[in-house]
Amino acid sequence: PAHLLMPLVISLALMATGSVMDSFSSNLTRPQNLYVSQFLLGFGGTFFLGPTMVLGTKNVLTNPRNLVSFSVMFGICQNLGGLIGAALLGTFQIVREKFHSSMIVEHLTLLDPRVAARVQSGGSAYGGIVADPELRNLMGIRSLATAATREANVMAYNDVFMLIAIIAIL
């Protein structure tokens, strides 16, 4: 069991590295930019499972009648851990998206010439389709709101990956 410590440390380091790599994403990040980092996360998680299971079977080897209990508990922990982990990370992502969204929107005012220009350019994209200038302005505002939400989501996912890295390091 002492020799199993190193694979656990390596797997946690791989997961932390992959998470840190993904925590600097932007709206320009594409799937091909995530291949290496997601491989590190997936491989690290899989590599973590083997030594953990071997460490858990240590007590089963000394008392074989605990095999069924171990198998059931291991399965329950895997399923509940996956569900609870996904739920907690999803909740964290939503909370962080709301935070980032409020921070972004707080700085958007139509009195700012850059914001007004962005709204106008967003509305001008519909110039050939929508004749009403008020409706085009509304479409420009909606376009800006969509961009702000997208940026807030990217920042929130960056926060999620940084949280995963921190958990892996601890």
Predicted regions located by residue number:
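Hydrophobic transmembrane architecture of multi-pass small-molecule transporters
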Residues: 73-170
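C-terminal module of multi-pass small-molecule transporters
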Residues: 1-109, 169
